[in-house]
Every structure is written in structure tokens, then in C-alpha cells.
Amino acid sequence: MTTRQATKDPLLRGVSPTPSKIPVRSQKRTPFPTVTSCAVDQENQDPRRWVQKPPLNIQRPLVDSAGPRPKARHQAETSQRLVGISQPRNPLEELRPSPRGQNVGPGPPAQTEAPGTIEFVADPAALATILSGEGVKSCHLGRQPSLAKRVLVRGSQGGTTQRVQGVRASAYLAPRTPTHRLDPARASCFSRLEGPGPRGRTLCPQRLQALISPSGPSFHPSTRPSFQELRRETAGSSRTSVSQASGLLLETPVQPAFSLPKGEREVVTHSDEGGVASLGLAQRVPLRENREMSHTRDSHDSHLMPSPAPVAQPLPGHVVPCPSPFGRAQRVPSPGPPTLTSYSVLRRLTVQPKTRFTPMPSTPRVQQAQWLRGVSPQSCSEDPALPWEQVAVRLFDQESCIRSLEGSGKPPVATPSGPHSNRTPSLQEVKIQRIGILQQLLRQEVEGLVGGQCVPLNGGSSLDMVELQPLLTEISRTLNATEHNSGTSHLPGLLKHSGLPKPCLPEECGEPQPCPPAEPGPPEAFCRSEPEIPEPSLQEQLEVPEPYPPAEPRPLESCCRSEPEIPESSRQEQLEVPEPCPPAEPRPLESYCRIEPEIPESSRQEQLEVPEPCPPAEPGPLQPSTQGQSGPPGPCPRVELGASEPCTLEHRSLESSLPPCCSQWAPATTSLIFSSQHPLCASPPICSLQSLRPPAGQAGLSNLAPRTLALRERLKSCLTAIHCFHEARLDDECAFYTSRAPPSGPTRVCTNPVATLLEWQDALCFIPVGSAAPQGSP
């Protein structure tokens, strides 16, 4: 057909005998330089005629209803242009449909295409897509929609090849709107295209508001470019209103594609008025831009959202009351100057939103929530859902840990409701609650142990505490690793409460102290924050420290780490109590030593400090022992009061605990102090912490009480629950991914060569050799 028309048209004839349309279009352009300026309007309007052609009306009854009036006006306005353009249009019509086999279209539609083709000439990518006919093929609407699509292709393809690719199938359709929904919109677009006159009418700000308000936010952001097109095609006065309207549209939040149909329908309904024709046009542009929006939205969630408010608008609370206020519209940075009318401006709009529009950090979350829920990206409850998701994920960890530890989901209950801002506090609170529960558990167990077993099982209970202490410390570390400040602050209070019995217990028996030390174990972190308290003990200990100042300063450190305040109270109380009951103190020392390598430090410190807090009892022993003075009597009373057995236990504990502490802090101090103090029991060998623990474990095993064992088991179970939970999560992940990889070796591995041979033969017989090879190779 191109050749036939070429004969008719000298321009085409001269350009190319072949049906290639690109050169033809370029030639046509030259004859109609004036047409190029109006090409956009003519394209939009000419397609309108197309639509109104009875043969082409198939899917556009609405368009026809709206079309006649604007068409007449448009004809009147563009009669000159049309007169000049009519000839090239026929060849264009023939040329375009010819590749698609749509040549049937009447001549006038071809004419309408001519101006569009002029636009296309500039866009080789658009021409390629048109020639391939993919855009039309993708849509079932037929040539008329294809024309609209072509226009869209022309406008959109200026942007990028990606856009062109997107155009082929989805460019013309809003990414999420069904094609059938788009048809009314396209019809409205055609009605719009008829003439600038109706557009001028529709561009009145009131009218735009009226149009916008019914569809409300439903208009897709893609409407922005459409308004710019309207601006381009309308009178100057209308342009100002259009710019305002475009601002409003820019302001309007992105709406789900499903909302578009409302706008389209409304446009169709108003297309008779001609006022909505502009909106339909806008939507026609949106069709192109919608696609881009969808792709970009998927790839760059945060960039395309014009502003946080629009994104939030889907949420019930954030719904923008009215897009009408122009001030708001102008607040939103318009990607392109409102006055620009070229498609380049539209492209800019599509591209710039990525850069200019304030990226929505929350949008990715919103879309994640949407994807998770399988809802369209603009589902209303997106933001709330996200917090729930993430909170649930975090809570899952916390809840599993908490439930495994506590068997109660109390802390998680508070967290799920908390917004993102509250998550951090919620985590802290959860940890604090966990710690509190563990402390209560320990307190109950320890109190039971202290009440029934501490006195009889001085060594045993202390050993139990020694073994349990690392567990407690590990738990406290795992739970409080992130929250030494907050967690420890709470712990010290609890420990102080639990520690109070400790000072009281020293009076009753030296062993209760081990129980408090077990709790002081957490204070280690807390004590670290409060080294000052040990300093007073140092001052108190100054008497003792004088002989062993180096040992004590480090013990002070250890005290600070192990028990800042509690040691002070216990030490001060010990000053009172230990003095009366020096043997009790040695036992506490044992208990402390056994309770924790660090607590042994504290115990050692307390031993040092206990002497310090109890300068009368221990300063004597320490200094005298070092000095060889009355120190032995001090320790001796202990030995006597404590009984030789406690002394031996103390030997072990002190040997194990004190030397380790000393080894940690000051080996010299340990040797001095222990050499001075322990000649009574036995010269305690200075042992490393490792050595300390094994003896403690051995002794503890020998002396453990059933309740102590139960407590130990519970503590271990708590720790194991945490580890098991993490491991379980890892296992789940591994299982998930491994299960996802079904590809395994051949389903049938034939060890029998005869069977394999037969299989190969079968494959060759019944299956192409190419496919047989993979089957044959087991």
C-alpha cells in the first residue's frame, strides 16, 4: 500500500519505493514544517476523528458522544492545518497499518496519523516499536487504540529505550489496570483530543477541581503529564489554571491503579461536557506514565512518591482532604516547569520524580507490606502493616526467647503495638523484663538454697553458685549485651534487693553471701559503672591494702566490676558482721570465689575488702599475716569458728578463687594475701581461673543439693533455649532454601548397564536425540 500511495504522493514516491515508513515520515515532515508544531494537538485530535469514524467506533461509543462537539471545534480551529496535512495522512495511515495488517482503516484515519507520524519521525525507537506493531499487538482494542498507543509510544519513547520496551505491552495500559478498564479512559482521551477549545473550557480551575474532587485522589499521578499536555494545547489563560491544576495533580498522592478506573469513568461521563476531556487526555498520558510509574515504583519505590503525604494518603488518617488547594500543589516540587508543553517536559516529569520528589523512606516498607499481603501497592493500611511485620519478626525472636526463658509472652505483648519509634524501647523493655524474670527465678532458687542448704552446704551451695554464676553471667550478657546501662541499672536494683539479704546473710552465715554474689554477678557490669564505691572500700581497706595496695586496687576494680554497691553494703555490713563472724566471711569468700571467677574477685576483694570493711578482723590477718603479727589469730579464729573443714574448703575456694582473682588482677597480691592469710589453712597455690573452675566444679558436684541441681538445670535450659531458638531459625532457613532446590541427580540411576542401554534405546527411538542425551546420561 505504501507503494501505491507513493505513486499518489510525489514526496513518498521520491523518498522510497519500499514500504519503509521512517523515510516517508521524515519527508512528510519537511513539507509541513508548521504541522510539526501542532503535531501533538493534531495527533490527539486526529485520533479523535479516527475514533469517531463509524468503522472505528467499535469500542468507543462514549468517545463518539463526547467527540462531535469538540471535533467540530477542532476542525474549525485546525482546518488549515488539516488541509495541509490530509495528503500525508493517507500514506501514513497506509504505512502504519500495513506492517500490522490493519490497512483496512479508512483514509481519514490515515490522515489523522500523519501529524502523529511527524512526531514519530524524530523518535526512531518509537518508529521501531510501531513498525514491529508490538504496542498494537499487545492490545486487543484494534487500530484506534493502537493509534492512541502510538501517540503514547511517541511521547514515552522520547524518554528511554526502557520506556519503549515497557510501552510495547504495558506502556499503554496502566500497569495494574485491566485493559478493559483502560478502554473508557482511552475513549475519553480521544474525546479530549478533538480540540483545544473544549480543553480550554475544561481547564478552568473550578472545573478542574470539580473533576478532581469527584475522582478525588483516584487520578493517578500520571495525570500530571496529561495536565502539562493540556497546558501545552490550551490558551495562555487556561494554561495558568492548568498549571495550578497540574500542581494539584502533582500534589495528589499516587493512587492504586484500581482507583484509576474511577477517574477514567468519570472522565468518560464528563467527556460529553468536554471538561473531562482534559482529564481523559491527562489519563492518556498517564497510560504512558502509569507504566513508567509502575516500573519505577517497583524498582525505585521511594523515588516516585511525590511526597510523604501522598504516600500516606492511602492511610485513612492521612487522606489528603482535597487536592484543590493550589498552594499545596505548588509546595510539591513539580518535576518540570508547569509551563513547558513538550513531551520532553513530560519525560522530565517521569524521570525527575526520582530525583526531585522527596523520596519516601517508608514507601519501600509500604510496598513490602503490600507485596506481603498481595494487595495493590497503594493498599490503605500499608504503613501500619509494616510495623507489624517488622515488629513481628523482632518479636518472634524475642518472644521465642522470652517464652523459652519465661514461658510467658508478656514483653512481646507490649512490643507489637509499639510503632517503629518504640521498637528500640520495646526491645529494651523486653530484655529488662527477661532479666527481671530471671532474677526472680534466681532469687527464689537462691533463697530456697540459702534457707535450707546454705549453712549445711557452705561449700556445696557456694560451688553451685560458682557453677551457676557463669550461666547467670552469660545470660545477663546475652540479654544485656546491648543494654548494660539500662539492663544493669535494673539489675543492680534487683540485685541490691537480693543483695540486701546478702549483707543480712553474712550475719547469719557466711554462705548466704554466695547467693547474693550470684546476683552480684550481673552487677559486675553494673559495678564497673560504679568503681567509686569500691574506692570507699579501698579507703576502708586502706588499713589492709597498705600491706597489699596493689592487690587491693585491682580487687577494687574487680569489686567495681563484680559488686560496686552491694559489695560496699555487704562489706560495710561485713565490717560489722564479718568481724563478729570472721569464719563466716571466709565462707562468703569461698562462696564468692566459687560463685564467679569475677565474683571470686569480688569475694577475694571482699576477702581483701572484707578485711578492708572489717579491718579489725582481716586487716589484722592480712597485715599481721604479711607482717607475721597477730594476723594469724584473726585467721585462726576464722579457722576455728569456720572449722577446719571450712578452712580446707576455704583453702580450695580461696586457692581456686583468690589466686585466680589475684592472677587476674595482681598475682603478687594474691601470693601476698594468701600467703599471709592461708598459712592458717594451707599455703594456697596460686591457680589460674581455669584451675579455679575445675576444683569448684568438682567440689560442687560432690556437694550439690537436689534443689541446686534443679536450679542449675533451669538456668542451663534458659541458656539453651536462647541458643536453640537461634539454631532453630538457622535450621528453618537452611531447610527452606534446601527444600527450594529440588534439582537432584537423575531420578533413576541405573546400576544395571543393560537397563541403561535399553533406556537409551527407548529415548533414541521415541524422543529426539537432543532431548535423549540428557535422559540417557544418568
From Swiss-Prot:
Sequence repeats lie at residues 516-548, 549-581, 582-614, 615-647. It is found in: Cytoplasm. The modification Phosphothreonine is found at T363. Residues 235-244 have a biased composition (Polar residues). Residues 516-647 are annotated as: 4 X 33 AA approximate tandem repeats. Residues 1-115, 212-244, 406-425, 508-587, 600-641 are annotated as: Disordered. Disulfide bonds: none annotated. Strong expression at implantation sites. Was exclusively localized to the apical side of the syncytiotrophoblast. Also found in macrophages. Residues 1-11, 560-574 have a biased composition (Basic and acidic residues). Keywords: Cell adhesion, Cytoplasm, Phosphoprotein, Repeat. One of its GO terms (biological process) is cell adhesion. Residues 513-523, 612-622 have a biased composition (Pro residues). It comes from the Eukaryota. GO terms for cellular component: cytoplasm. The modification Phosphoserine is found at S16, S98, S170, S324, S334, S344, S362, S376. Could be involved with bystin and trophinin in a cell adhesion molecule complex that mediates an initial attachment of the blastocyst to uterine epithelial cells at the time of the embryo implantation. Directly binds bystin, and indirectly trophinin. PANTHER family: TASTIN (PTHR15289:SF3). This is Tastin. It comes from Homo sapiens.
